[in-house]
Amino acid sequence: MTTFSTCAAFLSLVVVLHAVHVGGAILESQAPHRELKAYRPLQDNNLQEVYASSAAAVHYDPDLKDVNIVATYSDHYGNIRLGRVKMGDLSPSWVLENPAYQVSRKTKGSQLVIPRDSFQNDTGMEDNASHSTTNQTDESENQFPNVDFASPAKLKRQILRQERRGQRTLELIRQEKETDEQMQEAAIQKSMSFENSVIGKYSIWRRDYESPNADAILKLMRDQIIMAKAYANIAKSKNVTNLYVFLMQQCGENKRVIGKATSDADLPSSALDQAKAMGHALSLAKDELYDCHELAKKFRAILQSTERKVDGLKKKGTFLIQLAAKTFPKPLHCLSLQLAADYFILGFNEEDAVKEDVSQKKLEDPSLYHYAIFSDNVLATSVVVNSTVLNAKEPQRHVFHIVTDKLNFGAMKMWFRINAPADATIQVENINDFKWLNSSYCSVLRQLESARLKEYYFKANHPSSISAGADNLKYRNPKYLSMLNHLRFYLPEVYPKLEKILFLDDDIVVQKDLAPLWEIDMQGKVNGAVETCKESFHRFDKYLNFSNPKISENFDAGACGWAFGMNMFDLKEWRKRNITGIYHYWQDLNEDRTLWKLGSLPPGLITFYNLTYAMDRSWHVLGLGYDPALNQTAIENAAVVHYNGNYKPWLGLAFAKYKPYWSKYVEYDNPYLRRCDINE
């Protein structure tokens, strides 16, 4: 017994485990227990888990089963803990080593070494343990040099595992960067291709986005007025005078309180009290006069009366807009008079007659860039010329052929005499000097002589004519029969020596060099233009009468329309195909206006049918004279912007946001403009 006690005392072991991380890793691994033997509970549950998960099979002498093993460890909170376990509770894989065989170790006495290879097959435990031991290897070796933490094979696996983790981390980072770059590129492409012409029409400031109750009281008070008038009419018909007077007084009070308010915020503080008072009056009227059938009749009469008023206001608005659009502003009229007076007073008319042949060679040189502008508006024409020259790379190669009427010829000549752009060549002609342009040759002039056409146009502003043909007011404008408007169909006759010419309207602004237009291969077509059709809009059936068999049998109703305003004409192909003859043929057929209304675009669509080359839309952006929601980027990137419509930039009707594109080419410091009070 003494021998056994001595031996037990001699072999009593104190195992110090540095478990700051190793213990935690084993705890978290939750690896399956293999061949565990029952052992008594330890003082701390965490230590129990350490031994239960790590002690796979202990090898020891059966006589030493009562030897105590004391272990220290750190729990999850960093506190140092002690635990005891009997040798008999450990697995057989635990071995006793004699320190005499450990040459590299200097400590004396027996040591207990945990053979980690005994649980290498446990994958989860291996991963977690290796992660913890890797971070704490140096520290453990310094504090506990007697503990063999891992075999060389285990260390190699740990190193390989760390390398794989590093490679995987780098791969994930690379994939994340690639994904971010792809998302950014997709977002950029989406933003570049995003069309916001429609979205631009919406704003959070629009009434659509106001609170639905923002004008609840205002609407209530207006509805009360309608109800009160209906009951008042019934009261009057039934000789209930007191109630009639009371209701009309309340109507007047409601109108006074409403005033010019457009929302509840504009109403005075007494509005709600007045609405309550009117509600009380309507309640009294309902109790005394309510008759469903009678009320329905009154409301129907009010509705019909209101509809008639709305129709009348629409007609009036249409007429006034058309009137304003075709009216020549007083400042522009002043400008023409001042220029014409100075032209003749200073004798420039005689001097020009002597010098008119000086630049004849340039005017007929087909290698230069020739423009045709037909207008009676001096200021508008000057903007077209200035914007073209200022944006041209070679202004000396640009030649402008301007044709105006007899009334504005002197003013146009005077303006370009004193304000001629540098280098460019300007020719101003009078349409009345074209003797070949007469009624025997020109269909439009011949039609103008008919009494029916004169009646249709020159009495268009008569009240009876307005009420009868309000829908056609746009076309009932004598300017549509002006020869300046139809001279575009006679370009080969006006310029017989030229091969190509660019036609420009006087309501356009040039923003880029137009010289590349002469290099476009039009593939044998006569007219180069930008198409205007979008979905079902601006197609042939919008302009032509397809109920007429002459139209329906020769043209496609769904054919895409295009725009006048900036058109490249191949005059050689024009002469070859006798385009002017085609125009005359269809113009004669439309003498009674059954094929199309009027204007120059419908006969243009017919004349150049299947002979029009579609140019890129960026060359010509239209709609600045009628559409307030155009794409701003498209406008700024366009070579030419066109103010087609009633809201011309020189009129007070113009859209303020579009006017700067035009006004920046106006010389507002010019003495003539200042004299006529033409300013921004």
Curated annotation (Swiss-Prot):
Where on this protein are sugars attached? Answer: N121, N128, N135, N239, N386, N438, N545, N578, N610, N631
Q: Which GO terms describe its molecular function?
A: polygalacturonate 4-alpha-galacturonosyltransferase activity
What is known about the tissue distribution of this protein?
Answer: Expressed in roots, inflorescences, siliques, leaves and stems.
Which topology term describes how it sits in the membrane? Answer: Single-pass type II membrane protein
Has UniProt tagged this entry with the keyword DNA-binding?
Answer: no
Feature: compositional bias, Polar residues: 130-145
List the subcellular locations: Golgi apparatus membrane
- Function per UniProt: May be involved in pectin and/or xylans biosynthesis in cell walls.
Q: What is this protein called?
A: Probable galacturonosyltransferase 3
